């Protein structure tokens, strides 16, 4: 199926910002003359003072680099003030609540007023340029207001996903030295309350330096209040002045810190700066999603993750877009929720995660067919590689074969999309992220660090910096160098494996730590998972390696079946043969364990570390499980593990 090619529809080639010829020209200029290219495209945002040098520094030595040196700007000014004259009364944010009966429309003028007032509230709490504020809010409009207010006065925000535990919150507050925490009484998810204020109180037992807690009354739930420390959001905003001049920021001043899990140790505080990040997110949002004035754009991510930072708030608002914020989940109140929202708000561009698509696919076509979706013109995926079967299901059923799919590859560290189709320029191959975005120079290297030419598989690295890239790990530049530049000095190591095909298209094969070495042969787990999911019985699978006496590592597959299939030994044998046929004998699974569900974080990522431990029977040392969406799933898997040892051998 990976051989399918979907050419660019003629209508897209004509109407899009970029056809193939334009892409090739722009890409060539962006890598041959990055200073000229980015100097030109940086004019898309407003600068208080122009830069003196577009790009300096390198990946060598101490790994320090700058973009738009000495340029002065303000992110909130670019997202709000400069849009007021032309589109003050245009809707900036459509907020769709967890309850399908609840939504709000917030214009640029209203958002600007709220942001200025809240920026003054932050100043009144003693916050100034360079200080850090921790934001622990659900997907409500106040989250957008809080981050833009921080940006307006030069306060560095650290947003903590509202699904994280008190321990995770405390660790992030302590690491960044946050003085103020902005939270809510409760969040809502699928009709169930999330005790955010209670979690905050628990976390603050370990954070003596937090001086103020600003609380949004979202559900009205009864929560603890600490007089003298807690500030009521609504009262404070009402009393604040709507006049707040934007702080003049240097292009290299920090904008935000966002924590991402490392393969070892505590989460890393990825630090993004102001000028390069905004230029990169705005340009990539316009070109990747072919965003035209009047389009309604919906990225389903949570703002607690980088996708929400870059492609719900900063990129879209810098482009004067109408962006949708969604508090809910795909299956509440039922499995048609996404598509009902699409119809309700006449969404044109829809960007979601493969894990959501696979969950929807498992429910069949009926919940999709129950809706119109005729407003959709473009679909996107983000967060992990999408297997060709899920891609085709999405293309055929959701987009009804009329909507191109932009399968985007990037990371918290990269700030924005690095490898992606452009809808008017790129012929699509299901499962491939296709080609690099402007200014991005990917390459594939083998484990010894030799650069591969032409088709080949290996580690994905990036040769040169780009404007949206992280500058350091907050408070730990050594860890930054160690993590990203020590394996192959002078090159940014992504930690992902990739394959480049004969057309120069990139296929992301999964994390390098998700590689299994079977009898000296390297296998990407994503490849085996794709083969399993291609079987009509399989809804989802996760594959890990486990210690094997003879082969070094064996293949252990967790398989979730579609609703109308029953597990049996016959089906297990059939799946083994299927994988052998799809990939070859080297990929034969040693064990297949039936899994009613897979352990996932609240952002939908499968926690493979836990699956590896269970496969290796190291169940008394599962490590940190606080980010699990459904802890009961793990208990089920452990219970089933013993049965697999005796009967699950494939």
Swiss-Prot record:
The keyword Membrane does not apply. Its cofactor is Mg(2+). It catalyses: acetate + ATP + CoA = acetyl-CoA + AMP + diphosphate. One of its GO terms (cellular component) is cytosol. One of its GO terms (molecular function) is acetate-CoA ligase activity. Gene3D superfamilies: 3.30.300.30, N-terminal domain of ligase-like. ATP binds at residues 383-385, 407-412, 496, 511, 522. The keyword Cytoplasm does not apply. Mg(2+) binds at residues 533, 535, 538. CoA binds at residues 189-192, 307, 331, 519, 580. Acetylated. Deacetylation by the SIR2-homolog deacetylase activates the enzyme. Belongs to the ATP-dependent AMP-binding enzyme family. Catalyzes the conversion of acetate into acetyl-CoA (AcCoA), an essential intermediate at the junction of anabolic and catabolic pathways. AcsA undergoes a two-step reaction. In the first half reaction, AcsA combines acetate with ATP to form acetyl-adenylate (AcAMP) intermediate. In the second half reaction, it can then transfer the acetyl group from AcAMP to the sulfhydryl group of CoA, forming the product AcCoA. This is Acetyl-coenzyme A synthetase. The lineage of its organism: Bacteria, Pseudomonadati, Thermodesulfobacteriota, Syntrophobacteria, Syntrophobacterales.
């Amino acid at each position: 199926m990976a051989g399918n090619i979907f050419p660019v529809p003629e209508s897209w080639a004509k109407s899009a910002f970029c056809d193939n010829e334009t892409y090739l020209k722009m890409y060539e200029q962006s890598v041959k003359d990055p200073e000229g290219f980015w100097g030109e495209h940086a004019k898309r945002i407003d600068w208080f003072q122009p830069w003196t040098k577009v790009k300096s520094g390198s990946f060598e030595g101490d790994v320090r680099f700058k973009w738009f040196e000495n340029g002065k700007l303000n992110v909130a000014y670019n997202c709000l003030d400069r849009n007021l004259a032309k589109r003050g009364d245009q809707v900036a944010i459509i907020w769709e609540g967890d309850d399908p009966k609840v939504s709000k429309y917030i214009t640029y003028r209203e958002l600007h007023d709220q942001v200025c007032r809240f920026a003054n509230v932050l100043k009144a709490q003693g916050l100034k340029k360079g200080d850090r504020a921790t934001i622990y809010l659900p997907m409500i409009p106040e989250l957008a207001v809080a981050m833009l207010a921080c940006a307006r006065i030069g306060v560095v925000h650290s947003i903590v996903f509202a699904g994280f535990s008190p321990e995770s919150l405390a660790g992030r507050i302590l690491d960044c030295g946050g003085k103020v925490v902005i939270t809510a009484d409760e969040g809502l998810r699928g009709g169930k309350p999330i005790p955010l204020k209670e979690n905050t109180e628990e976390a603050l037992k370990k954070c003596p330096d937090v001086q103020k807690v600003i609380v949004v009354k979202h559900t009205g739930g009864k929560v603890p209040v600490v007089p003298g420390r807690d500030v009521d959001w609504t009262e404070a905003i009402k009393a604040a002045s709507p006049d707040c001049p934007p702080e003049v920021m240097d292009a290299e001043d920090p904008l935000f810190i966002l924590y991402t899990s490392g393969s070892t140790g505590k989460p890393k505080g990825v630090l993004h700066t102001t000028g390069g990040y905004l230029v990169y997110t705005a340009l990539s949002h316009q070109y990747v999603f072919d965003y035209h004035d009047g389009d309604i754009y919906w990225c389903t991510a949570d703002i607690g993750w980088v996708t929400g930072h870059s492609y719900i708030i900063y990129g879209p608002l810098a482009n004067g877009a109408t962006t949708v914020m969604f508090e809910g989940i795909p299956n509440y109140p039922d499995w048609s929720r996404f598509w009902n929202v699409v119809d309700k708000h006449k969404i044109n561009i829809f960007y979601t995660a493969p894990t959501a698509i696979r969950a929807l696919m498992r429910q069949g076509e009926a919940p999709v067919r129950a809706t119109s979706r005729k407003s959709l013109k473009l679909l996107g995926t983000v967060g992990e590689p999408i297997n060709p079967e899920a891609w085709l299901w999405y293309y055929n059923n959701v987009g009804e074969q009329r909507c191109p799919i932009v399968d985007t590859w990037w990371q918290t560290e990269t700030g924005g999309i690095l490898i992606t189709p452009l809808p008017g320029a790129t012929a699509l191959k299901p499962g491939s992220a296709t080609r690099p975005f402007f200014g991005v120079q990917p390459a594939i290297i083998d484990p010894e660090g030799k650069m591969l030419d032409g088709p080949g598989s290996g580690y994905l690295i990036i040769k040169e910096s780009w404007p949206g890239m992280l500058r350091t790990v907050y408070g730990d530049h050594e860890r930054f160098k160690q993590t990203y530049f020590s394996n192959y000095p002078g090159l940014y190591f992504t930690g992902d494996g990739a394959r480049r095909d004969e057309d120069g298209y990139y296929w992301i094969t999964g994390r390098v730590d998700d590689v299994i070495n079977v009898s000296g042969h390297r296998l990407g787990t994503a490849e085996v998972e794709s083969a399993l999911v291609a079987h009509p019985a399989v809804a989802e699978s996760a594959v890990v390696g486990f210690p094997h006496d003879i082969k070094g590592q064996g293949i252990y597959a967790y398989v979730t079946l579609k609703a109308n299939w029953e597990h049996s030994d016959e089906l297990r044998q059939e799946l083994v043969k299927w994988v052998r046929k799809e990939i070859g004998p080297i990929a034969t699974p040693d064990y297949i364990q039936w899994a009613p569900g897979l352990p996932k974080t609240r952002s939908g990522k499968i926690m493979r570390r836990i699956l590896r431990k269970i496969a290796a029977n190291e169940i008394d040392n599962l490590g940190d499980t606080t980010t699990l969406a459904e802890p009961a799933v793990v208990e089920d898997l452990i219970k089933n593990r013993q049965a697999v040892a005796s009967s699950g051998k494939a």
